[in-house]
UniProtKB/Swiss-Prot annotation:
GO biological process: protein folding; protein tetramerization; protein transport
Name this protein carries in UniProt: Protein-export protein SecB
Family the entry assigns: Belongs to the SecB family.
Keywords: Chaperone, Cytoplasm, Protein transport, Translocation, Transport
Major location (coarse): cytoplasm
């Protein structure tokens, strides 16, 4: 295929995703029942983890993506520990079609941030006197789909029939 004058058309520039910065926006660790909570527990604590992703445009082609992770460990009768982390990154994204931009920001950017957030949480829990909490990998595609389905259902409920 040619561009009309016998030369092949120039290839479109490749998509680019650059991490410009990564940082902890907020970190909280609570061990409200220490030192009693540090004693051996009769059973494994119930651990509950909540993960959310937020994003906002900062400038043309630049986005701040925040990975929010909250968790708590509870024993039979009390809270053992809890934590909250907001870990963010600034990303420059160029040459990406508009229809692919939202999934890229909400799936790939948090996937790049997650290992760093996981390490911060493991260290905070360890420094709180417990074995490090190693979070399992997160299916950000599944999380994205779940959030999109929830938003679609909310929009459908809000619109009159």
């Amino acid at each position: 295929m040619t561009n009309g004058n016998g030369t092949p058309p120039e290839a479109a520039p490749p998509p680019q995703l650059n991490v410009l910065a990564q940082y902890t926006k907020d970190l909280s660790f609570e061990n409200p029942n220490a030192p009693a909570s540090l004693a051996p527990q009769p059973q494994q604590p119930a651990i509950n983890i909540q993960i959310n992703v937020g994003a906002k445009a900062l400038a043309e082609n630049e986005y701040e993506v925040t990975l929010s992770i909250e968790g708590k460990a509870e024993g039979a009768s009390s809270l053992i520990f809890s934590f909250e982390l907001q870990y963010a990154g600034v990303f420059r994204i160029v040459n990406v079609p508009q229809e692919n931009l939202h999934p890229l920001v909400m799936i790939e950017c948090p996937r790049l941030l997650f290992p760093f957030a996981r390490e911060i949480i493991a260290t905070a829990v360890r420094d709180g006197g417990f074995p490090p909490l190693m979070l399992d990998p997160v299916d950000f595609v599944g999380l994205y789909r779940q959030n999109m389905d929830r938003q679609a259902a909310e929009a459908q409920q809000a619109s009159p029939n």
